[in-house]
Amino acid sequence: EIKESVMLKIGLLSDTHAWWDDKYAEYFSECDEIWHAGDIGSVEIAEKLAAFRPFRAVYGNIDGQEIRKMFPQVNRFTVDGAEVLIKHIGGYPGKYDPSIIGSLMTRPPKLFISGHSHILKVKYDKTLDMLHINPGAAGMSGFHKVRTMVRFVIDNGAFKDLEVIELAG
């Protein structure tokens, strides 16, 4: 039996810190799913995103008990042939956070997503044969000068058409 590729378009953001921007919905209108890498900041933001598209998320260090009840600290799942792991505080290739390095080394996913640093980073880890994405921060809280999000396509386990979206102000 031939399994057809789904070709999913993913909208990825992090560190909204309770900040809503209508641009989230605008830029993610073509996406099949929205993923959030933590520090959502409010239940309202999570609910707005979840009402808009199928929504996967993790909680971050600033998220309160309500959000921690709604989402896990680590979200590991497989979608269109790609195993994905999302954790808010995760580090990046060459400098993974001690809290996740064991999982990454033992069973590396194809895609590891983290947030927390407010620094946009897309880097391939050759050692683990794994792509790492930190979409930067979409909210207003923090030192970052530019608010960013990411869109990409998963096609039969491969990642392509990655776009960085810069939000004004």
Task: Label the predicted regions.
Residues L12-S14, E33-D39, R56-N61, I86-H88, ...:
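Active-site neighborhood of phospho(di)ester-bond hydrolases with catalytic His/Asp-centered motifs
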Residues A18, S42, G91, I119, ...:
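Short active-site segment of divalent metal-dependent hydrolases/proteases
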Residues D63-P108, M140-F143:
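Active-site-proximal segments of metal-dependent phosphoesterases and phosphodiesterases across multiple
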Residues I2-F55, D63-G81, K145-T148, I154:
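N-terminal active-site segment of His-dependent metallophosphoesterases
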Residues R56, K95-A158:
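Conserved beta-sheet core of the metallophosphoesterase superfamily
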Residues T16, N61, G90-Y92, A138, ...:
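Short, solvent-exposed coil/turn elements at secondary-structure transition points
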Residues F55, V84, L162:
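Hydrophobic anchor at the start of a short beta-strand
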Residues L162-G169:
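Short, solvent-exposed aromatic-acidic interface loops
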